[in-house]
Amino acid sequence: MRWALGAMLFCLCTQVMATSEQQAMRVVGDAMVVPLSEVTGSAEEGEQIFAARDAGHCVLCHQVSGLDAPFQGNIGPALGGIGDRLSPAQIRLRIADASLLNDQTIMPSYYRTEGLHRVDERYRGRTALSGAQIEHLVAYLAQLRSQNQ
């Protein structure tokens, strides 16, 4: 399994995807090295997006201890200490399009617009989150360290 993942990552190491409205997704290995917006990510705004049930919907599947958000999910992994395990570039790729790392993931692609299934006509060609929103989430998640939990 690890060999297959390694082969897939090697094949993806220079993949670039974009539409005219969105910043290019430049994937190197298991990370997206180029930010998706010129906006510098704000951890405070990222926390709000993470907890909002009308924005990123992150708390429907994930949980962070100490976060003021009731009924946090348990479908996805708990994200406490994620900043110790992944770099900001690795976090960015997992938010933007986790299916590039695991084609069986149930996590939605928040930035990819092509090759999706059953997308309502009103939302076709639109990202679920803007590049700036993703950068805010990256800033928030990257600062979640084990000693902070």
Range-by-range predicted roles:
Residues 1-9:
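Sec-dependent signal peptide recognition
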Residues 20-53, 148-149:
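Electrostatic cytochrome c docking/interface patches
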Residues 36-40, 63-100, 106-120:
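Gly/Gly-Pro-rich "capping" loops immediately C-terminal to redox-active cysteine motifs
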Residues 46, 54-65, 91, 107, ...:
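The canonical Cys-X-X-Cys-His
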